[in-house]
């Protein structure tokens, strides 16, 4: 979620993939954050883009746009903000601020395609899939300041053990349980959809300081190696398109 920093409601896409070699910090009102830029991976970005379109996701693509805390904050858990950040990044901006919002099922299916894209990329890479989006919160209207820590705990548990229950929920249900802005947790289903059914919970922590409940969740994918025949077939599928 870009928080209307570089992507505005006059042209607001459901899914926007970055295809660039660098992503700098945006000015979110107090000047750009003094953090290192994220280094892009052009080859993997292009491959993911081809896979998404081949699987009939109507994507937008961007270059030269600054990224905000929704993208940069998780990187601070991986290294020193003065940089350079470890590894390279492929940002995906999801339009969760203006209706119609893509469904939870759509997020999940995009994650499944993301997995196939990563598995079929010719270079042997170690890839971590990161999702962001605040847990329960609402910043406007009669429920401004709303938190629901019980729902947040249930959401995190379902994400680990029974994600299909979350896939079947409507956006309105997410908003009712977690606040309008808290509905952005559907973006976590992209990450979970990119993993196998068999995951190990490595770390889980929540903290509700004021306006937003914040969680850190780390899974290890215990799924086996991909079937090479299926990988080759998927490469042909992408190439055919």
Label every model-predicted segment:
Residues 1-2, 92, 125-135:
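Beta-strand elements within well-structured catalytic alpha/beta cores of enzymes
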Residues 6-109, 120, 142-241:
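Flexible, D/E/H-enriched segments
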Residues 112-127:
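Non-transmembrane, aqueous-exposed alpha-helical and coiled segments at domain scale
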Residues 138-139:
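Short, solvent-exposed loop/turn segments at secondary-structure junctions
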